[in-house]
Regions:
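Positively charged, small/polar-rich N-terminal and surface patches that mediate targeting and assembly
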Residues: 1-113
Length: 113
């Protein structure tokens, strides 16, 4: 299994989610994040004092089986390219194990009194 983390512009989320849906890959989580890059940060000013402004981005996270990694990367690339001027950073991490933490009626233990 692999975990894919994609940081992209908010405008590209619709295209990427549509491309993942067409490739039948999912589900995924989405989070709003702010990136602060001191080397290339846009400058703002407050009462004449300059400060770095963060860039608003969206982070998508999904865990896929080994055989779906390449199709998922291609779907993400196609979703970004469909937008035209899209920009994204993709990180692929190997996952050794995962577990579902939601309680289910079949796995609950009965308490003895």
């Amino acid at each position: 299994m692999h975990k894919l983390e994609v940081v992209l512009q908010a405008d590209c989320v619709g295209g990427v989610s549509e491309a993942l849906r067409k490739a039948k890959i999912g589900p995924f989580g989405a989070s709003d994040i702010t990136i602060f890059d001191p080397a290339a940060a846009p400058q703002g000013s407050y009462r004449g004092a300059p400060y770095a402004i963060g860039r608003e981005r969206v982070k998508l996270e999904l865990v896929v089986p080994d055989h779906e990694v390449e199709p998922a990367v291609e779907a993400i690339r196609d979703g970004i390219d469909a937008f035209g001027e899209g920009y994204a950073e993709l990180v692929v991490l190997a996952v050794q194990d995962s577990m579902d933490l939601r309680p289910s009626p079949w796995t609950r233990r009965r308490e003895t009194r």
